[in-house]
């Protein structure tokens, strides 16, 4: 009888080579896409629908900005691939695990030194997260204070950058720690039939995140100010009343303290009241009609049940991942290859980790690397679904009579954000969650004022 678990649990399977190969293949594929996009940026002509909307100076700046981001993307990908290969080649996971155990033994009283694998996993992930943050500091610094600064977008100070990082790590430990503990305890409690318990748990976490993050977490990083009474507020409330949108409050967020990029969105569970959030950069630079048109698009996502659709898709994606994980999560050869053993028969491994139970967190992290080919394919699917949603939301705003103002707002945002004008189709189908501006304007049947005249 065909038993996938037994077939995969074989000491001769080169797990390190497989994961390294998948990682290199993903890097090569994504680098190829970036190369295609970089070549596309050499084009000196705008898409026809943008010819009367974008001046030469803006087009030139946009091309330079996009090229700089493409180069940085390649460097970042090389940097991240090198990290992954170093971790695999030099068995850094068991080394960090030993550090975690030593830290626990140093902190806890002697009688608690034989701590559980779950406790060791939590400490391991805390150390790994801290190490990853430190290793990624140069990339983060360059992104904000060199690349974004060069093109006039960065408003961050070094002090605010460091403060944000400390807050993020603190929240990750304070909130992520208990969530991870419960996640691992499910495997501990239900080692053979964890799938449905994990599904329910992650669904609850997702719903709580959608509820808690906008109301309690995001205000720790930005100031949310109620929109003042006036023309804009009346226009938004009138739109909400017209379409039956369950509007609760409208806030303006001080996004300008970090970046000059603009955005607008709403928060709230699918069947509850909603909060609309406007970036101050949007409020200060766009007309009332344009902002209302942008929100008509956002409300289109609500009216078309896109949030519900994405939650369902997310759950199906999660189910697929954990269904596949059942075939390998207790695979002895898989853990042994990376230095984790349940007994002392460690062969030639120099500094093995001996645990009472399978360290699920290690297995899941490495398993995600095995999923690289599947996740690359899923990326195309997720981008397609998201782009379809954007077209539908645009069509909804057009149906409400906001076509021209939405187009003007999209063009204005494109100019102010120096967004890419010419995009390679394969690159965008993988990386872009939104259609390009040219694609959206074409779908909306936009005709510039110059051509009308």
Swiss-Prot record:
Pfam families noted in UniProt: Peptidase_M48 (PF01435), Peptidase_M48_N (PF16491)
Family in the record: Belongs to the peptidase M48A family.
Residues in the Cytoplasmic compartment per record: 34-89, 143-167, 219-306, 379-453
The encoding gene: STE24
Keyword line: Endoplasmic reticulum, Hydrolase, Membrane, Metal-binding, Metalloprotease, Pheromone response, Protease, Transmembrane, Transmembrane helix, Zinc
Note: Present with 19600 molecules/cell in log phase SD medium.
The species this protein was found in: Saccharomyces cerevisiae (strain ATCC 204508 / S288c)
Recorded GO MF terms: metal ion binding; metalloendopeptidase activity
Chemical reaction(s) catalysed: Hydrolyzes the peptide bond -P2-(S-farnesyl or geranylgeranyl)C-P1'-P2'-P3'-COOH where P1' and P2' are amino acids with aliphatic side chains and P3' is any C-terminal residue
Residue positions of the active site: 298, 394
One GO term describing the cellular component: endoplasmic reticulum membrane
Membrane topology: Multi-pass membrane protein
Subcellular location: Endoplasmic reticulum membrane
A single BP term in Gene Ontology: CAAX-box protein processing
Gene3D superfamilies in alphabetical order: Metalloproteases ('zincins'), catalytic domain
Function: Proteolytically removes the C-terminal three residues of farnesylated A-factor mating pheromone. Also acts to cleave the N-terminal extension of the pheromone. Does not act on Ras.
Protein name listed in UniProt: CAAX prenyl protease 1
EC number: 3.4.24.84
Topological domain spans for side Lumenal: 1-12, 111-121, 189-197, 328-357
Source organism phylogeny: Eukaryota, Fungi, Dikarya, Ascomycota, Saccharomycotina
Parts of the chain that traverse the membrane: 13-33, 90-110, 122-142, 168-188, 198-218, 307-327, 358-378
């Amino acid at each position: 009888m065909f038993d996938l678990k037994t077939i995969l649990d074989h000491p001769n399977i080169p797990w390190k080579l497989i994961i390294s190969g998948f990682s290199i293949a993903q890097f090569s594929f994504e680098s190829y896409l970036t190369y295609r996009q970089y070549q596309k940026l050499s084009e000196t002509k705008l898409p026809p629908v943008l010819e009367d909307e974008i001046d030469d100076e803006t087009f030139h700046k946009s091309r330079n900005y996009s090229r700089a981001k493409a180069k940085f993307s390649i460097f970042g990908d090389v940097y991240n691939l090198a990290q992954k290969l170093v971790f695999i080649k030099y068995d850094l996971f068991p080394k960090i695990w030993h550090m975690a155990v030593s830290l626990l033994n140093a902190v806890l009283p002697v009688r608690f030194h034989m701590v559980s694998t779950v406790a060791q996993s939590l400490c391991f992930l805390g150390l790994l997260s801290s190490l990853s943050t430190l290793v990624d500091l140069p990339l983060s610094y360059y992104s904000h204070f060199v690349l974004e600064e060069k093109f006039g977008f960065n408003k961050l100070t070094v002090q605010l950058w460091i403060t944000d990082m400390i807050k993020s790590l603190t929240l990750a430990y304070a909130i992520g720690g208990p969530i991870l503990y419960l996640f691992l305890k499910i495997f501990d409690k239900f080692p053979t039939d964890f799938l449905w318990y994990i599904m329910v748990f992650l669904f609850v976490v997702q719903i709580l995140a959608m509820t808690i993050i906008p109301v309690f977490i995001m205000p720790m990083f930005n100031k949310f100010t109620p929109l003042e009474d006036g023309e804009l507020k009346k226009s938004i409330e009138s739109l909400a009343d017209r379409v039956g949108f369950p509007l609760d409050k409208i806030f303006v967020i001080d996004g300008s303290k970090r970046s000059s990029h603009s955005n607008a969105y709403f928060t709230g569970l699918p069947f509850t009241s909603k909060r609309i959030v406007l970036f101050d950069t949007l409020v200060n630079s766009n007309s009332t009609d344009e902002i209302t048109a942008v929100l008509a698009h956002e409300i289109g996502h609500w009216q078309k049940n896109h949030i519900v659709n994405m939650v369902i898709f997310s759950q199906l994606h999660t189910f697929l991942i954990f269904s596949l994980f059942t075939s390998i999560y207790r695979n002895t050869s898989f853990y042994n290859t990376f230095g984790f053993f349940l007994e002392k028969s460690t062969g030639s491994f120099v500094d093995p980790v001996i645990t009472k139970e399978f360290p699920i967190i290690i297995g899941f992290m490495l398993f995600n690397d095995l999923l690289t080919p599947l996740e690359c394919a899923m990326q195309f699917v997720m981008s397609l679904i998201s782009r379809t949603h954007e077209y539908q939301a645009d069509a909804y705003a057009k149906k409400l009579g906001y076509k021209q103002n939405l187009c003007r707002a999209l063009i204005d945002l494109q100019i102010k954000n120096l967004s890419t004008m010419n995009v390679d189709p394969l690159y965008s189908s993988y990386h872009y969650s939104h259609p390009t501006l040219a694609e959206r304007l074409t779908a909306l049947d936009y005709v510039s004022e110059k051509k009308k005249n």
